[in-house]
């Protein structure tokens, strides 16, 4: 028995009265709904509701999840527009994208980009999204849109990781576009409205500041500049002199280094390649602008050939994302031991007493011969007591002439209840091959059997991106980390109660100020 006790202490970390968690039921209702039911206990009366509330709040608000936050659809500037060849409106497409559930095996710290490029006829589903390698779709059959024979849908999706939910308000002055081109003329800022010319005015102001330092020559010719909205990120900007009647183009970089020198000296080769691609796109943008001034009718066809769209036609659309992987949490508290005992193990009657006693005897709790005989006789006495309505203090024991104290009888029924009570939480108690079956529960859990305990029955529903038991594990870790930080917190030094002398001085000063009033 000593060896078994030491093994148990090493398993539970020398905790005399541990809290056990048992997954009693786990069901996959559909691809986007997992259900789990857990028994947590035993807890002292009053502790159950404290722990249950904390677990529920942690499950609903402390777990990370993935969601689509921003969408860019080619040729769409707002969510109330429609697309040619697409059955759904843009608003319906955004709502369908919001319902897509994503999961990842590792933490996603940066925003990820996914793409959709489909041509009709056909049905677009979540499985058609080109996702990063680290992100998966829970339900690939999630419906997005239906295309006709002439329908084409090009879409860019931004995926982020977060907690709770995200409410976004669209701002016309901030867009996450990669780049755009603006034709800067002298009187263009004055003719446009204040909102439309906000970015244009900023560019003019920056150019004026550069003129003061002599970096840019003062010329009245219109300049075509290529820049990004981020502003803070460095980019290879170049300026081009465009004559309205001239077809010649002359390019000049801000620095005099060649492309080969820049590529050799650049620390990040991939960044240089991306920037060089932007330069190529800018050349196409310049050609498009000149072609527009010469032949406006052929401008739309040229845009389609270069896969470019006008600035005002494509804008990012924001989605109010929901990151919570746990959709619903319910809990109930059971404070009566006898109620749980009656639900799982029916009350012993005279007819099946011997049958039930054999089941208890084969349970694996190895008691001594005297204890076994005493338990059996006590169960017979309990069945007789249930038939009699009188409340006598002493009862005869099977006609042997001996008297059994009612306290001893209560202890015997309690010891029988120990096995049934702890089998609620641990499946190992029902397994004869387990080392737990050779232990008597009274040795380690005697303090818990003296009074009723709280048992938490916790029900968890997830959206399919995480298992209920994994969600419970992460919520428990978050709570434990929070309380560990609180336990290791240091009290700030406060001289108010440091010594009696400072305390009396402070009280005297407060009293003097009070008298002055």
UniProtKB/Swiss-Prot annotation:
Major localization listed first in the record, in broad terms: plastid
GO cellular component, one term: DNA-directed RNA polymerase complex
Enzyme Commission no: 2.7.7.6
Leading EC class: transferase
Record keywords, A-Z: Chloroplast, DNA-directed RNA polymerase, Nucleotidyltransferase, Plastid, Transcription, Transferase
Domain of life: Eukaryota
Domain text: The N-terminal domain is essential for RNAP assembly and basal transcription, whereas the C-terminal domain is involved in interaction with transcriptional regulators and with upstream promoter elements.
Name of the protein described by the UniProt record: DNA-directed RNA polymerase subunit alpha
Gene it is expressed from: rpoA
């Amino acid at each position: 028995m000593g060896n078994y006790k030491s093994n148990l202490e090493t398993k539970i970390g020398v905790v005399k009265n541990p809290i056990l968690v048992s997954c009693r039921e786990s069901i996959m209702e559909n691809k986007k709904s997992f259900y789990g039911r857990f028994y947590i206990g035993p807890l002292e009366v009053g502790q159950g509701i404290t722990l249950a509330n904390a677990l529920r709040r942690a499950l609903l608000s402390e777990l990370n999840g993935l969601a689509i936050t921003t969408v860019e659809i080619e040729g769409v500037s707002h969510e109330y527009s429609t697309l040619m060849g697409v059955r759904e409106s843009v608003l319906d497409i955004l709502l369908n994208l919001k319902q897509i559930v994503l999961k990842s095996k590792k933490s996603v710290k940066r925003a990820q980009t996914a793409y959709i490029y489909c041509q009709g006829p056909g049905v677009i589903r979540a499985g058609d999204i080109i996702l990063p390698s680290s992100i998966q779709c829970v339900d690939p059959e999630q419906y997005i849109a239906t295309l006709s024979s002439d329908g084409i849908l090009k879409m860019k999706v931004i995926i982020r990781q977060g907690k709770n939910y995200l409410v976004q308000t669209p701002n016309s002055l901030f867009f996450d576009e990669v780049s755009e081109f603006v034709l800067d003329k002298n009187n263009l800022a004055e003719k446009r409205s204040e909102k439309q010319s906000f970015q244009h005015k900023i560019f003019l102001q920056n150019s004026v500041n550069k003129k003061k330092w002599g970096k840019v020559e003062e010329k009245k010719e219109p300049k075509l500049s290529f820049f990004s909205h981020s502003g803070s990120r460095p980019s290879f900007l170049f300026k081009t002199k465009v004559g309205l009647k001239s077809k010649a183009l002359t390019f000049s970089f801000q620095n005099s280094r060649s492309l080969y020198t820049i590529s050799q000296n650049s620390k990040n080769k991939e960044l240089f390649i991306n920037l060089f691609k932007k330069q190529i796109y800018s050349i196409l943008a310049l050609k498009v602008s000149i072609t527009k001034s010469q032949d406006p009718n052929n401008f739309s066809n040229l845009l389609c050939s270069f896969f470019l769209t006008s600035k005002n036609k494509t804008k990012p659309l924001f989605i109010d994302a929901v990151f919570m992987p746990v959709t619903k949490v319910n809990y109930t508290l059971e404070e009566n031991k006898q109620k749980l005992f009656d639900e799982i193990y029916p009350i012993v009657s005279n007819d099946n007493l011997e049958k039930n006693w054999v089941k208890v005897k084969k349970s694996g709790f190895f008691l001594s011969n005297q204890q076994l005989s005493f338990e059996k006789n006590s169960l017979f006495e309990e069945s007789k007591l249930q038939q009699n309505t009188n409340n006598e203090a002493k009862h005869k024991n099977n006609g042997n002439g001996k008297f059994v104290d009612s306290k001893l009888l209560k202890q015997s029924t309690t010891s029988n209840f120990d096995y049934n009570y702890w089998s609620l939480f641990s499946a190992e108690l029902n397994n004869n091959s387990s080392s737990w079956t050779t232990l008597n529960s009274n040795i380690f859990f005697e303090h818990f059997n003296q009074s009723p305990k709280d048992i938490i029955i916790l029900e968890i529903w997830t959206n399919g991106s995480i298992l209920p038991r994994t969600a419970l594990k992460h919520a428990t870790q978050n709570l434990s980390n929070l309380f560990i930080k609180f336990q290791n917190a240091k009290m700030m030094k406060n001289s108010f109660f440091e010594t009696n002398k400072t305390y009396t001085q402070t009280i005297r000063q407060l009293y003097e100020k009070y008298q002055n009033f």
